[in-house]
Amino acid sequence: MSAIVDIIGREILDSRGNPTVECDVLLESGTMGRAAVPSGASTGSREAIELRDGEAGRYNGKGVLKAVEHINTEISEAIMGLDASEQAFLDKTLLELDGTDNKSRLGANAMLAVSMAVAKAAAEEAGLPLYRYFGGSGAMQLPVPMMNIVNGGAHANNSLDIQEFMIVPVSQPTFREALRCGAEVFHALKKILSDRGMSTAVGDEGGFAPNFGSNDECLSTILQAIEKAGYRAGEDVLLALDCAASEFYHDGKYQLAGEGLQLSSAEFTDYLATLADKFPIVSIEDGMHESDWEGWKLLTDRLGKKVQLVGDDLFVTNTRILKEGIEKGIANSILIKINQIGTLTETFAAIEMAKRAGYTAVISHRSGETEDSTIADIAVGLNAGQIKTGSLSRSDRISKYNQLLRIEEDLGDIASYPGKSAFYNLR
């Protein structure tokens, strides 16, 4: 038995300089697991609640000492002595202790830190890499990365309304080569922007944040960067968008302030369809407001056979909401953010439900990250096939890519890179 003998919660800082929660779990054998939780900027209204202190004079109210206290007191008391290898039972214990639908009492940040740290301790105790502990002998597929090389919206201070413009390397035989492709396109884009006298400062997720005149201009420039790096757009590298449409939906209209447009759901569907016809876009995330299910249905009926339509704010990694979406034919993919739901067990259930329905599951970081690379192990362990973890800069993003390189090396000849086949929802 891998008995838990000590739990320590602490307040640390994330990549934006805001407090977040870290937890150490110590087992009877002396083995320790450590985990830190991320935090989002554009958040869905139905996400599990991250507990903040609200004390204006300290970290502008964003402190997490209350969440840390919960870990060090009642959570510690509830799980002390439990077997760390019994993840489902441990997470169930946390859920019952919290007693709310949205984890607002203990805080999803406190609960997730403990859930992750326990899993890492148990993996270490078992002598297994974390991805192998999660997935067993079937874990051998590396994920296709969606690399955010231009930031807009809530992730940057510029005129772009769409939040993320991503490249997706798909023709490469290995993850290592896919990562090299992404890095080379990233540096080619930097040179293009610099030559034009445009800003090469980066946003929260490590992508560039220049002031383009339109989304069209941004996408055209990315195509130039792909070509400049020696790759073929539409063959070697595809494009992906995260609209984060809930952020610019006001008074029943999609208000693209950067382009001076106010569009209905049908008009915004047309707008996105035009972009998908003009550019090799394989994936669009949050193409409609999280509550605009009629708009989502329009978008899915229009583009769902040729473009991956990912629900982030729409589904918030919640099986109850995902089940409703599947039944209504809304979207064809779910974004998986571990802190949207708050425990590993619930996260894995959402991935499994998506796969059973023929939806893809894209494992994702948050805009406020740490050096914790657990999501890389989840992506491989659960054979998710896709990961979204930022650009090719900032160590909080690179840490996940580097962990995937290590995993691929560890897997050796049995490692596989799915490329275009990761988008099985479009077959």
From Swiss-Prot:
CDD domains (UniProt xref): enolase (cd03313)
GO molecular function: magnesium ion binding; phosphopyruvate hydratase activity
Co-factor remark: Binds a second Mg(2+) ion via substrate during catalysis.
Catalytic residues as annotated in Swiss-Prot or TrEMBL: E205 (proton donor), K337 (proton acceptor)
Subcellular location: Cytoplasm; Secreted; Cell surface
One of the GO BP terms on file: glycolytic process
Cofactor(s) this protein cannot do without: Mg(2+)
Record-listed (2R)-2-phosphoglycerate binding positions: Q163, K337, R366, S367, K388
Transmembrane segments: none
GO (cellular component) term, any one: phosphopyruvate hydratase complex
Residues binding Mg(2+), per UniProt: D242, E285, D312
Pathway it works in: Carbohydrate degradation; glycolysis; pyruvate from D-glyceraldehyde 3-phosphate: step 4/5
NCBIfam families per the UniProt record, alphabetical: eno (TIGR01060)
Family of the protein in this entry: Belongs to the enolase family.
Protein name (record): Enolase
Organism, as annotated: Burkholderia lata (strain ATCC 17760 / DSM 23089 / LMG 22485 / NCIMB 9086 / R18194 / 383)
GN (gene name): eno
